[in-house]
């Protein structure tokens, strides 16, 4: 067996094995702040053609949930249905009970970035109009944002539960979201810009693809970004970590 054949045998099915059991793959790239304005201008992305969201996370000042692999989040979406999400990662797909697939808000997917592939399971449920604002104002408890199904989901997937009495509100993040197409990219592109109250920004560009297209999509999307001159953020922070660490720092400082 020659060298090329050995190399091919070693890598054959490598991506497919990493993604076994998930329904879809989202390939994400973080754009550094000094490239954000150029990206917005290139695709004419403005606050007039976006989907605007306000995102709140719920965790302890020490980010105990996040450290344990759990995320509790609520989104106020301008002009659309508000919702809340519980997510657990990483997961082993074949250990996730199939009974959760009956829920429209269930997702079993993988996120791919320069740092690797992470599989997650999440359950999103609608929330009542105005409920998020009431919780943030302290008029309702955080627990009111999450359903019994979401509680059962975390217990089933992560063998854990959330003590809402120990959680604080982290946020809001103001988010702008766009979907658009580029002739050079065969996949529909999503851009999301998050803004913190201190003025810091983080932009993520992503595509979603069926698992069967994963290997081609990963290589193709990275090649597309290089071709259009989109510089990747070498830190490759996830939006969630970037937001949580900032607001958790603020909480800890208030307690000093």
Task: Describe each model-derived feature in a short phrase.
Residues 2-256:
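Phosphate-end processing signature that detects enzymes handling 5′-triphosphorylated RNA
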């Amino acid at each position: 067996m020659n060298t090329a054949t050995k190399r091919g045998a070693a890598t054959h099915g490598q991506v497919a094995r990493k993604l076994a059991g998930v329904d879809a793959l989202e390939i994400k790239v973080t754009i550094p702040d000094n490239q954000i304005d150029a990206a917005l201008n290139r695709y004419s992305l403005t606050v007039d053609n976006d989907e605007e969201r306000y995102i709140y996370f719920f965790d302890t000042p020490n980010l105990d949930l996040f450290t344990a692999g759990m995320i509790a989040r609520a989104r106020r979406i301008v002009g659309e249905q508000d919702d809340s999400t519980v997510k657990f990662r990483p997961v082993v797909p074949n250990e996730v009970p199939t009974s959760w697939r009956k829920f429209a808000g269930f997702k079993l997917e993988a996120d791919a970035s320069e740092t690797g592939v992470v599989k997650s399971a999440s359950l999103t449920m609608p929330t009542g109009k105005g409920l998020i604002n009431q919780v943030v104002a302290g008029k309702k408890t955080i627990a009111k944002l999450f359903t019994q199904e979401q509680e059962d989901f975390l217990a089933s997937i992560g063998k854990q539960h959330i003590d809402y009495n120990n959680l604080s509100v982290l946020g809001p993040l103001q988010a702008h979201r766009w979907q658009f197409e580029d002739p050079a990219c065969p996949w529909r592109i999503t851009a999301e810009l998050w803004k913190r109250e201190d003025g810091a920004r983080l932009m993520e560009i992503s595509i979603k693809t069926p698992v069967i297209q994963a290997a081609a999509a990963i290589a193709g999307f990275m090649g597309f970004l290089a071709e259009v001159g989109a510089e990747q953020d070498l830190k490759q922070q996830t939006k969630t970590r970037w937001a949580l660490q900032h607001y958790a720092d603020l909480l800890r400082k208030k307690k000093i």
